[in-house]
From Swiss-Prot:
<dbReference type="GO" id="GO:0005886">
    <property type="term" value="C:plasma membrane"/>
</dbReference>
<dbReference type="GO" id="GO:0071555">
    <property type="term" value="P:cell wall organization"/>
</dbReference>
<keyword id="KW-0808">Transferase</keyword>
<comment type="pathway">
    <text>Cell wall biogenesis; peptidoglycan biosynthesis.</text>
</comment>
<keyword id="KW-0812">Transmembrane</keyword>
<keyword id="KW-0997">Cell inner membrane</keyword>
<dbReference type="InterPro" id="IPR023346">
    <property type="entry name" value="Lysozyme-like_dom_sf"/>
</dbReference>
<dbReference type="InterPro" id="IPR001264">
    <property type="entry name" value="Glyco_trans_51"/>
</dbReference>
<keyword id="KW-0328">Glycosyltransferase</keyword>
<dbReference type="GO" id="GO:0008360">
    <property type="term" value="P:regulation of cell shape"/>
</dbReference>
<keyword id="KW-0472">Membrane</keyword>
<comment type="function">
    <text>Peptidoglycan polymerase that catalyzes glycan chain elongation from lipid-linked precursors.</text>
</comment>
<dbReference type="GO" id="GO:0009252">
    <property type="term" value="P:peptidoglycan biosynthetic process"/>
</dbReference>
<dbReference type="GO" id="GO:0008955">
    <property type="term" value="F:peptidoglycan glycosyltransferase activity"/>
</dbReference>
<dbReference type="GO" id="GO:0009274">
    <property type="term" value="C:peptidoglycan-based cell wall"/>
</dbReference>
<comment type="similarity">
    <text>Belongs to the glycosyltransferase 51 family.</text>
</comment>
<keyword id="KW-0573">Peptidoglycan synthesis</keyword>
Amino acid sequence: MKILRKLLFWLIVVPVLLVLLLQLYFFLQIGWWVNHNPGSTSFMRHQLSILQEKNPKAQLKHKWIPYNRISNNLKRAIIASEDSNFSEHEGVDWDALQKAYEKNIKKGKVVAGGSTITQQLAKNLFLSGDRSYLRKGQEVIITYMLEYWMDKERIFEIYLNVVEWGVGIFGAEAAAQHYYGVSAAQLGAPQAARLAVMLPNPRFYDGHRGTAYLARRTDLILRRMNSAALP
């Protein structure tokens, strides 16, 4: 029986404790970021390591700028494109998740996530790019931690500064400079709409900027963005 108890301890209790400690780390780290800007994210570090495998001197293009120095055009375009209910939900849009789940069942694999802006931020800050229901569950937990600690404006500010916008391009300022040679504060509505549309697949659109889909989707977001509610 002693051997069985020890076995159960190592197989069940220890893994559970490790998972709880990991959640505590996430919780405290998010609390720190309420008043301190993250210098990088898990996803940024992962992408940098990939770039440096080909070029050891490779660096990311990234510059943090305050929320009030980012064009409202870009904020509205991203909300219109990525998460129209951002200002209203509590971090998770369960209707969108249900639709994604049904799509995944139909396809027989995970092809859609139904993620909100807060969920995307949770993934970028801490998680890998793998698609699995286990990772999705962790994403939801971190999402609620973000919503517990931060108001919507702070969540959106961090998102705008760390989201990927191309090969080695992270954040609104780097994206504005990379694609248009202007600061994020100077982005016009058409520029902002195009940047927003790139977000689901930024590395692809970095190299394929003239696709018909990008043009059609940009026109759609231009029509929708004025009604997007900012936090």
